[in-house]
């Protein structure tokens, strides 16, 4: 006799949405309050989404700083690229403004390069992550105001120059991206 094993369906957003449809306004507010109390990441998401408590980027920048420039003398002295990328991803889900995304990509690169030059930290995976964030910053340039572009370009060229000290072809790769995105800039010849 063959036994039949019934597969249990994994819950999805559709299931949650169906349950939420039965909530009244007070019930939804209480649910959000419970989520808010449950996790700091939920608090950060809601603060960012509703622009509560000052600069929503500041908390995400602090997380990037903590992940990419750890206290090398402390207990948690490992560089955590995944945590830094997660901070950017969470900002994107909460707000996702192009200007903010650009700022966080630049922050990631600047903090990582500072750590690398201060402590001689290196590794192909580390620099690949820096390059990918640098590339995302370059790609965002065309989607922001000229004023923001100019500031971002200054910072990107500074990063390219700092990369000349780290090897792994990082400076060349960054330079190629900048020359392609901004071909008439005299800094491409540096």
Give the location of each predicted region:
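N-terminal interaction modules that seed assembly of large macromolecular complexes
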Residues: 7-74
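Surface-exposed polar/charged interaction patches
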Residues: 23, 38, 70, 74, ...
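Short, charged/polar micro-motifs that form catalytic or ligand-binding hotspots
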Residues: 6, 18, 95, 99
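Residue-level signal for alpha-helical context at structural boundaries
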Residues: 34, 38, 46-50, 64, ...
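Eukaryote-biased recognition of C-terminal alpha-helical segments
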Residues: 131-190
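Charged linear interaction tracts used for macromolecular binding and regulation
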Residues: 65-147
């Amino acid at each position: 006799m063959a036994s039949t094993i019934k597969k249990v369906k994994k819950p999805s957003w559709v299931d949650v949405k169906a349950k939420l449809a039965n909530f009244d306004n007070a019930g939804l507010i209480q649910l959000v309050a419970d989520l808010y109390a449950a996790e700091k990441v939920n608090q950060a998401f809601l603060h960012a989404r509703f622009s509560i408590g000052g600069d929503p980027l500041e908390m995400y920048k602090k997380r990037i700083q903590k992940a990419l420039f750890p206290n090398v003398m402390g207990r948690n002295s490992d560089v955590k690229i995944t945590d830094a990328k997660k901070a950017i991803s969470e900002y994107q889900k909460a707000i996702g403004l192009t200007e903010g995304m650009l700022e966080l990509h630049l922050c990631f690169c600047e903090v990582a390069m500072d750590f690398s030059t201060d402590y001689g930290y290196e590794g192909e995976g580390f620099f690949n992550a820096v390059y990918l964030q640098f590339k995302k910053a370059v790609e965002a340039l065309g989607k922001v105001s000229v004023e923001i572009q100019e500031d971002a370009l200054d910072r990107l060229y500074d990063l390219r120059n700092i990369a000349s000290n780290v090897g792994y072809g990082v400076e060349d790769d960054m330079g190629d991206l900048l020359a392609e995105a901004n071909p008439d800039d005299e800094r491409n010849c540096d």
